Amino acid sequence: MKLTVFSAKPYDIEYLGGIATNQNSSPAIEINFLHVPLSSETAAFANGADAVCVFVHDVLDANVLRELYAAGVRAILFRCSGYNNIDLREAERLGFFVANVPSYSPEAVAEFAVALIQTLNRKTHRAYNRVRDGNFNLDGLLGRTLHGKTVGIVGSGRIGLAMAQIVQGFGCKLLAYDPRPTEAFKKYGEYVDLDTLLSQCDIVSLHCPLMDSTQHIINDTTVSKMKRGAMLVNTSRGGLIDTQSVMKALKSKRLGGLALDVYEGERALFYKDHSGDIIHDDLLMRLTTFHNVVVSGHQAYFTEEALTEIAECTLRNLDDWAKGVPTANALVQGRNSNGRRERGLARL
């Protein structure tokens, strides 16, 4: 079984390669790691592979899928939860097996969201830089106590639930908005409509998937309904936020702070070193000049535990496909490695 991994970083090689070596899979897996992202220009590098492993910024449009199919690839494995970058209907038509890693260490993302909140709130990033320059003045570093504040969680899935469990420990009141409420979350907070959440919360944290109904869920209209001076945190998907809208809200002081681990235009920038380049994304560069904005490079998931779970689940998905065993992680069941057609589109 030959697997080609696109957009491979050193940590992908360490975790995927290490776990593949140590696990007993049948048939044995031969992995080819490529640092280049998958696109129409690089799809030919998968020639001879049974499967490809891709990441959130790889391109899997109809043209790329057809090139992969012509190269002999029959399975596509996402080593992430998001799959907005693939044409699933074309993948189904061609008979691909497609699977993702739906959840990995939700606590990692929730913990990072809280870290962003406290960095922004208590201004530890500014204090760190001051002290390095010998400046121990506290002016401009005033924060607020989280205890007693109201935190709104948009999306109460596994990450949203983990967020609720952590924030409850600070003594915060919790509100949530989700079209699909869960009994598990009701132990920690109250479900309300989005307008109520925005108007009452001191902190709003986004933990919902990106789809048509959530694209730019934060926009001119919804920002105008937020409590004045509230903090907005996004560790989910960049497309949830209309960046122009939050920029205006920051300038008018409607928003008191913004913490982003994801960004709508991140594909051209994130996971790469641009320290020696001129960055042409004027919107992002403008955001980073605000004293009340913190931006990180999509690292909320980035823990040892999460990388282990991702590697194990990715290889388990491959093993299930190779053995013709249905997997709950399939986005498209396609054909198994023996060419037998399984049921079509699993979910969209």
From Swiss-Prot:
Induction: Expression is positively regulated by the KK-1 cluster-specific transcription factor kk1F. The active site is at R237, E266, H298 (proton donor). Its EC number is 1.1.1.-. NAD(+) binds at R158, I159, D178, C208, P209, T235, S236, R237, D261. GO terms for biological process: antibiotic biosynthetic process. PROSITE patterns: D_2_HYDROXYACID_DH_1, D_2_HYDROXYACID_DH_2, D_2_HYDROXYACID_DH_3. Gene3D superfamilies: NAD(P)-binding Rossmann-like Domain. Disruption phenotype: Abolishes completely the production of KK-1. It comes from the Eukaryota. GO terms for molecular function: D-lactate dehydrogenase activity; NAD binding. Pathway: Secondary metabolite biosynthesis. Coiled coil: none annotated. InterPro entries: D-isomer_2_OHA_DH_cat_dom, D-isomer_DH_CS, D-isomer_DH_CS1, D-isomer_DH_NAD-bd, NAD(P)-bd_dom_sf. Belongs to the D-isomer specific 2-hydroxyacid dehydrogenase family. D-lactate dehydrogenase; part of the gene cluster that mediates the biosynthesis of KK-1, a novel cyclic depsipeptide with 10 residues which is a promising active compound with high activity against many plant pathogens, especially Botrytis cinerea. Within the pathway, kk1H catalyzes in the synthesis of D-lactic acid from pyruvic acid, which is recognized by the A domain of the first kk1B module. This is D-lactate dehydrogenase kk1H. It comes from Curvularia clavata. The lineage of its organism: Eukaryota, Fungi, Dikarya, Ascomycota, Pezizomycotina. The gene is kk1H.
